[in-house]
From Swiss-Prot:
Converts heme B (protoheme IX) to heme O by substitution of the vinyl group on carbon 2 of heme B porphyrin ring with a hydroxyethyl farnesyl side group. GO terms for molecular function: protoheme IX farnesyltransferase activity. Its main location: membrane. It is a multi-pass membrane protein. It is found in: Cell inner membrane. The gene is ctaB. The keyword Transferase applies. It catalyses: heme b + (2E,6E)-farnesyl diphosphate + H2O = Fe(II)-heme o + diphosphate. It comes from the Bacteria. It comes from Maricaulis maris (strain MCS10). Belongs to the UbiA prenyltransferase family. Protoheme IX farnesyltransferase subfamily. Its EC number is 2.5.1.141. It is an enzyme of class 2 (transferase). This is Protoheme IX farnesyltransferase.
Length: 330
């Protein structure tokens, strides 16, 4: 049985940690997550109905990237015990012993403050306020409160990851509009099926770390059903930009085709035995492995789905490819 490493253990070890490289601090910012954050924020900024100053737009996106990275660093600092326990996260900078918990906290706090202040100077106070709130929501509300206490952690905490396109929109326009809320809601609804697909085939990892993800707390069968239900709502809601005129024919086709495949993969999970690795039934091993593959497929595809969906908005608004859909677009 693995030994659980507590935050205090890492805090004590942190004093002896050698000087980390810039790459270690970059890894602390969760660069893969940060990339998707920046991309969706850029889509929100580009889709906004104004011509933003290129330099100020660049600075706004940079501030959002730093803010997202700062939130990631604070998350890793607080979750040092969990990361040391889970196979998926053991190679992160803190579990590897190259960055101390105290240094990660310091880095996260300083980067958070700088990103918010620069956003206020480069863009507007509303965008800066939303950035500050999203950092707080992820680092405190989700990481410190929800993640370890409720299987709804991802549902509620997903709001933090849904803010980037809204912040990009507000950075350009200075106001929150219906379209900005729609972009927020698309990511908010996307987060549960995306995260629970991962949690299904990594349920043993989460159970070992005592993280009450949905498969651990409510079981694999309930999780598979909820993935399907959230996927249906997501795919339907993803068509909303067409109804408001934000998305045109390119976006509509992307949403329709991408959504159909999303639902197919979600249905495969629902009909599978994903997340039942502990099943003792005879002959269950093959079915469970096939189910876990279905969960892996949806997890991987969901990232591409969201990327292509927002890329369609960029193509329409940045490259003049917007074509209204007769009888649908206003």
């Amino acid at each position: 049985m693995d030994t659980i490493v507590t935050p205090s253990d890492h805090r004590a070890e942190g004093e002896a940690v050698s000087t980390a490289s810039p790459r270690d601090y970059f890894d602390l910012m969760k660069p893969r997550v940060m990339t998707l954050v920046v991309f969706t924020a850029f889509a929100g900024l580009i889709a906004a109905p104004v011509d933003a100053d290129p330099f100020l737009a660049f600075m706004s996106i940079l501030c959002l990237a730093v803010g997202a990275g700062a939130a990631g660093a604070l998350n890793m600092a607080y979750d040092a015990d969990i990361d040391a326990t889970m196979q998926r996260t053991r190679k992160r900078p803190i579990p590897r012993g190259v960055v101390s918990v105290s240094n990660a906290y310091g880095f996260g706090v300083v980067a958070s403050i700088l990103s918010v202040l620069l956003m206020a100077l480069a863009s507007n106070y509303l965008a800066a306020g939303l950035l500050a709130f999203s950092i707080f929501f992820y680092a405190v509300i989700y990481t410190m409160i929800l993640k370890r206490s409720t299987p709804q952690n991802i549902v509620i905490g997903g709001a933090a990851g849904a803010f980037p396109p809204m912040i990009g929109w507000v950075a350009a326009t200075g106001e929150i509009s219906l379209d900005a809320v729609i972009l927020f809601m698309i990511i908010f609804l996307w987060t549960p099926p995306h995260s629970w697909a991962l949690a299904l085939y990594k349920s043993g990892d989460y159970a070992a770390a005592n993280v009450p993800m949905m498969p651990v707390a409510k079981g694999a069968k309930s999780t598979r059903l909820q993935i399907l239900l959230y996927s249906i709502v997501l795919v339907i809601f993803a068509g909303a930009p067409v109804l408001t005129g934000l998305g045109g024919a390119v976006y509509g086709a992307t949403s329709l085709g991408g959504g159909a495949l999303f639902l197919l993969l979600a249905w495969r999970i629902f009909r599978s035995r994903a997340g039942e690795a502990g099943s003792a039934e005879e002959g269950a091993l093959y079915a469970v492995r096939a189910g876990d593959k279905a969960a892996r497929d949806l997890f991987a595809y969901s990232i591409g789905y969201l990327t292509v969906l927002f890329a369609a908005l960029i193509v329409e608004h940045a490259f003049g490819a917007y074509v209204a859909i007769p009888g649908v677009s206003p």
